[in-house]
């Protein structure tokens, strides 16, 4: 699997073995594009804050 894994400029990198999901985490308090985290995961991460949005997907570079 390959996922985007940078907060700013979109850079796609291969995921470590066993990490078959891509995720994107953002916060509704910030304008779109700010405070975004992307990466690979074994399971879909849980949100840490009330206004946090987590999206998970299972195809290459799906976390744009």
Curated annotation (Swiss-Prot):
One of its GO terms (molecular function) is toxin activity. Pfam families: Toxin_cobra-type. Keywords: Disulfide bond, Secreted, Toxin. PROSITE patterns: SNAKE_TOXIN (PS00272). SUPFAM superfamilies: Snake toxin-like. InterPro entries: Cytotoxin_Cobra (IPR003572), Snake_3FTx (IPR003571), Snake_toxin-like_sf (IPR045860), Snake_toxin_con_site (IPR018354), Toxin_cobra-type (IPR054131). It comes from the Eukaryota. GO terms for cellular component: extracellular region. Disulfide bonds join 3-22, 15-40, 44-56, 57-62. Its main location: secreted. Expressed by the venom gland. It is found in: Secreted. Is classified as a P-type cytotoxin, since a proline residue stands at position 31 (Pro-31 in standard classification). Belongs to the three-finger toxin family. Short-chain subfamily. Orphan group XIII sub-subfamily. This is Cytotoxin homolog S4C8. It comes from Aspidelaps scutatus (Shield-nose snake).
């Amino acid at each position: 699997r390959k996922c985007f894994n940078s907060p700013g400029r979109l850079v796609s990198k291969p995921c470590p073995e066993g990490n078959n999901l891509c995720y994107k985490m953002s916060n509704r308090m910030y304008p779109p594009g700010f405070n975004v985290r992307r990466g690979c995961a074994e399971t879909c991460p849980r949100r840490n804050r009330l206004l946090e949005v987590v999206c998970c997907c299972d195809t290459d570079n799906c976390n744009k």
